[in-house]
């Protein structure tokens, strides 16, 4: 196994680890929700509010870990393509060497900065075989068409007998807390869309 393949393995491992962290935060969110119910039943609204804040924080953290997992996974796919095509540049190899400690830290800010460096390397990467790139992007596209995502979400909601309410205008989501959370999510979604456009 070459050094580059080891680093590629570490990238894929980090994506899985981030995904595990996301699931852990999901569990924490559920635990906090259970505590909210207990506190409300006891009439202790102050404690309930603290658990509600914790639940929202865990939910946002779960989403952040999941987004970063997807981003690292996408970069791993790009590195795999570069390795396969023999197009790993010296500067890209340098970025890859510096990543091991960053990925182990599970620090989202540091990992995000590292992914920025990777994405910059791919922007400057001169792809020799455009036809191969086109073929690969058709089979393993990194950017998912939004309408397909929406259709799948709707399909899953229909199967579960739920109403997605995707057409609801912002601000009609109910309480102030949820509209703030949705505003944060909208901002994250916009940032992710901008990142996709850069890739």
From Swiss-Prot:
The GO biological-process annotations, alphabetized, read as: endosome transport via multivesicular body sorting pathway; late endosome to vacuole transport; protein transport
What keywords sit in the KW lines? Coiled coil, Cytoplasm, Endosome, Membrane, Protein transport, Transport
**Where on this chain is MIT-interacting motif (motif)?**
186-196
The record's subcellular location field reads: Cytoplasm, Cytosol; Endosome; Late endosome membrane
Q: Specify whether Secreted is a keyword of the entry.
A: no
Q: Per its record, how is this protein called by name? A: Charged multivesicular body protein 1b
> Where does the chain cross the membrane?
none
Q: Does the record carry Cytoplasm as a key word?
A: yes
How does this chain sit within the bilayer?
Answer: Peripheral membrane protein
Described purpose of this protein according to its UniProt entry = Probable peripherally associated component of the endosomal sorting required for transport complex III (ESCRT-III) which is involved in multivesicular bodies (MVBs) formation and sorting of endosomal cargo proteins into MVBs. MVBs contain intraluminal vesicles (ILVs) that are generated by invagination and scission from the limiting membrane of the endosome and mostly are delivered to lysosomes enabling degradation of membrane proteins, such as stimulated growth factor receptors, lysosomal enzymes and lipids.
Cite a GO CC annotation.
Answer: late endosome membrane
């Amino acid at each position: 196994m070459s050094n580059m393949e080891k680093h590629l393995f570490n990238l894929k491992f980090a994506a899985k680890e981030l995904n595990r962290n996301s699931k852990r935060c999901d569990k924490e969110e559920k635990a906090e929700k259970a505590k909210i119910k207990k506190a409300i039943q006891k009439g202790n609204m102050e404690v309930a509010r603290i658990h509600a804040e914790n639940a929202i924080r865990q939910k946002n953290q779960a989403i952040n870990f999941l987004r970063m997992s997807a981003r690292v996974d996408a970069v791993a796919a790009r590195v795999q393509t570069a390795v396969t095509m023999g197009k790993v540049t010296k500067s890209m190899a340098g970025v890859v060497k510096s990543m091991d400690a960053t990925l182990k830290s599970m620090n989202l800010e540091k990992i995000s900065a590292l992914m920025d460096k990777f994405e910059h390397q791919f922007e400057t990467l001169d792809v020799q075989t455009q036809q191969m790139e086109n073929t690969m992007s058709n089979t393993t596209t990194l950017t998912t068409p939004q309408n397909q995502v929406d259709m799948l979400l709707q399909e899953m909601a229909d199967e579960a007998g739920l109403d997605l309410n995707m057409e609801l205008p912002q601000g009609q989501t109910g309480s102030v807390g949820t509209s703030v959370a949705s505003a944060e999510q909208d901002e994250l979604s916009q940032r992710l869309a901008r990142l996709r456009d850069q890739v």
